[in-house]
């Protein structure tokens, strides 16, 4: 049950980030609209620029926290979608078996030659 709670909390955090990105875009739009006017309201521009900067920093921090969490969760478990390591181990084992067969056949040949003499 705690796992679902943690997952729901993570999803809520991502939804908050999404809303914050919407606010960032809205702030940017307001600034662009204000800049397109002949006479701009400096205080409005300053407030919107400060809100934009604060929102971007908040989104960056939250996304970094989400990425750190996902990295911590993922590093403790093998990547299930990749079989490269297993295939490579199998290929190396087959090469060792072939090499052992080659050496055993050399030993057998040497033994047969010694018995013939």
UniProtKB/Swiss-Prot annotation:
The keyword Isomerase does not apply. The modification N-acetylalanine is found at residue 2. This is Mediator of RNA polymerase II transcription subunit 11. It comes from the Eukaryota. Disulfide bonds: none annotated. Component of the Mediator complex, a coactivator involved in the regulated transcription of nearly all RNA polymerase II-dependent genes. Mediator functions as a bridge to convey information from gene-specific regulatory proteins to the basal RNA polymerase II transcription machinery. Mediator is recruited to promoters by direct interactions with regulatory proteins and serves as a scaffold for theee assembly of a functional pre-initiation complex with RNA polymerase II and the general transcription factors. The lineage of its organism: Eukaryota, Metazoa, Chordata, Craniata, Vertebrata. GO terms for molecular function: transcription coregulator activity; ubiquitin protein ligase activity. The keyword Acetylation applies. Gene3D superfamilies: 1.10.287.3490. It is linked to Neurodegeneration with developmental delay, early respiratory failure, myoclonic seizures, and brain abnormalities: An autosomal recessive disorder characterized by congenital microcephaly, profound global developmental delay, exaggerated startle response, refractory myoclonic seizures, progressive widespread neurodegeneration, and premature death.
């Amino acid at each position: 049950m705690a796992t679902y709670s943690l997952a729901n909390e993570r999803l809520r955090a991502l939804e908050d980030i999404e809303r914050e990105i919407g606010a960032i875009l809205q702030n940017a739009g307001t600034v662009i609209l204000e800049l397109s006017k002949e006479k701009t309201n400096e205080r409005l521009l300053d407030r919107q620029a400060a809100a934009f900067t604060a929102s971007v920093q908040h989104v960056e921090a939250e996304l970094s926290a989400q990425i750190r969490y996902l990295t911590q969760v993922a590093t403790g478990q093998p990547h299930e979608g990749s079989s490269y390591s297993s295939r490579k181990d199998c290929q190396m084992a087959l090469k060792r078996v072939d090499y052992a067969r080659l050496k055993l056949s050399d030993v057998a040949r040497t033994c047969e030659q010694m018995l013939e003499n």
